[in-house]
Amino acid sequence: TAGDANIKINTAIGSITLPGNMLPEELTGAKTVSMSIALADKSKLSQELQQRIGDRPVIELNLKVDGKSYSWSNDDVPVTVAIPYTPTEEELRSPEHITVWYIDSKGNIIEVPSGRYDPETSSVIFSITHFSQFAVVYVTKAFDDLDTVPWDRKAIEVLASKGIIRGKTETEYAPQTDISRAEFLYSLVRALGVTAS
């Protein structure tokens, strides 16, 4: 059916795979639907955010319906984005720390847990359920108390870097501490990319 078909848009800035059912039924009668992917103006970001992102790309995704901006969001229909990216030598030593941030309208950052570097396509790939600004970032989170679990150190730090799990503080993970059901559910929801709806 038409809802099962995907549309892939390729540009020099990136590619987007759009599910055929991404738009709500109320837009069925629209005459034109246009989508844009563009490099965002980093100078509009805070100095701190500009420093944290560095030379990495920041993209902006927009949708217009019949020439008017449309705020698309659909938790049930993720869109896949791929941004061409060449990691630095440091990043190539730990490419699992290459990830993506969603930058909201107030300049706040929200981790996109699905963000990852794909060496086969030399791109950063991630799935989203709304359009906005997204930045490729390299995040390393380290905890000072992981010596008792050396076999888990890398996994814990990568998951924390992607926002899937959280430490007790910025430098303490507390690996021997029991987790609550709520903490487990938070991590599971973030890892799977599911929503409450």
State the predicted function of each range.
Residues 56-57, 136-144:
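Short domain-boundary/entry signatures in modular proteins, especially
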Residues 12-13, 115, 127-132:
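Secondary-structure transition/turn motif
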Residues 61, 67-72, 121-129, 173:
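Generic recognition of long tandem-repeat/solenoid scaffolds
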Residues 124-140:
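C-terminal beta-strand-rich structural cap/linker in extracellular carbohydrate-active enzymes
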Residues 107-114:
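Surface-exposed loop/edge segments in extracytoplasmic proteins
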Residues 118-122, 151-154:
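Glycine-rich adenosyl-nucleotide cofactor-binding module
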Residues 140-195:
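Extracytoplasmic Gram-positive cell-surface binding/anchoring modules and repeats
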Residues 1-106:
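Proteolytic processing hotspots in large secreted/extracellular or virion-associated proteins
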